A protein has these predicted regions:
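Acidic, low-complexity Ser/Thr/Gly/Pro-rich repeat segments typical of extracellular/periplasmic
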Residues: 2-227
């Protein structure tokens, strides 16, 4: 009940944001949280950003979400990003730029799965520690696929239990925990996404990170060539 109450408060405080990652509104990125079903597109999806989720420019004006709605998915080169507070990437088993081949081994701390084909996608990770926002709780991890993503395909991204610089496990978000641990909630925003996210968790488990070991998993659809 305590977990559900905390998650409900998170959803209520930022209804336009993704409750899977409490630190950044649009994270993890890119995500099906900001897609909608659309039977008239090639992918069956289109981008759908609530106005309240859009970043604000230097003039204090929110970016207009409307132009994005013309896309039936995300660009093939869209950066894949997630916030992992104070993570030690090496100790967490994240594949490095020097050795990206480990990203398709079962011991990899991150996985990208092409849900259209079932194939794992080789990639490397980069920790973005910019000094101007060098706060431990704002550590951004980027996943860089070695090849361009396939137009029209749906992808899953998974992160195994990461550890911080002291070797301590970094706590999982309330939002992902209720999905991973199959904890039913009375929160509509959560339950509406449960079925889709369950598919993602299962795909990540099949790709080598067991359900109980998952720290975060999400999905997104790449735009079609016809878009």
């Amino acid at each position: 009940a305590e977990l559900e109450a905390a998650l409900a408060a998170t959803v209520d405080d930022a209804p336009d944001c993704d409750w899977l990652d409490h630190s950044e509104c649009l994270f993890p990125f890119p995500s099906s949280r900001f897609e909608a079903d659309d039977p008239d597109t090639e992918t069956g999806r289109r981008l759908a950003f609530p106005a309240g989720a859009m970043p604000v420019n230097l003039q204090g004006e929110a970016v207009d979400p409307e132009p994005f709605a013309r896309s039936d998915g995300w660009g093939v080169g869209t950066p894949i990003m997630v916030t992992i507070a104070g993570v030690d990437p090496e100790a967490s088993g994240f594949p490095s730029e020097a050795d990206p081949a480990t990203s398709v081994d079962d011991g990899s701390g991150t996985v990208i799965v092409d849900l259209t084909t079932g194939d794992r996608v080789a990639h490397w990770t980069e920790v973005d520690a910019r000094p101007e926002i060098d706060e431990a709780d704002r550590t951004t991890v980027l996943l860089h696929p070695l090849t361009m993503l396939e137009p029209g395909h749906r992808y899953a991204v998974g992160v195994g239990q990461p550890v911080d610089q002291a070797g301590e496990p970094i706590p999982v978000s309330d939002g992902f925990r209720v999905i991973r641990d199959r904890l039913e909630t009375g929160i509509d925003a959560v339950e509406q996404r449960r079925e889709r996210l369950d598919e993602v968790v299962a795909a990540v488990a099949a790709a080598g990170i067991e359900r109980a070991e998952q720290w975060l998993a999400w999905d997104f659809t790449v735009m079609s060539e016809q878009n």
